[in-house]
């Protein structure tokens, strides 16, 4: 039994083209079915807060994944790194970057909507400090994780609280 990671940042086809994922949603669906049939665990990587993405759209992605036989999920915020097309686009026309409080609230909602049996492998990420343009607050990963834990406890949020599958 081993793991395979499939990138699945969004359901919106415009985002898939923008980030150059290179394949449509149906390819992801087929790969999940084939991997599961082969006895391979599927861990999905979701990037939150793509340019123009709303929280409702992010939750639709979570709901979609809940309907798939995935075993694990990695959630993280979009990072803008120096030398990338995304950095160029951001410099030309800055788009919304959430502050830590907004991200934590969104992560709380994602966790509440996530199927209880899906293993959470990641709640945040930290881009290379020398390349990270935004969001700068992600560099304090331990602080972010502590704040997420405190928020979940204070708001009485647990995985699957809002899942009605």
Predicted region positions:
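Short, small-residue-biased leader/transition segments that mark boundaries at the very start
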Residues: 1-2, 8-13
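Catalytic cores of alpha/beta
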Residues: 51-67
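Auxiliary Fe-S-binding modules of radical SAM enzymes
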Residues: 66, 72, 79-165
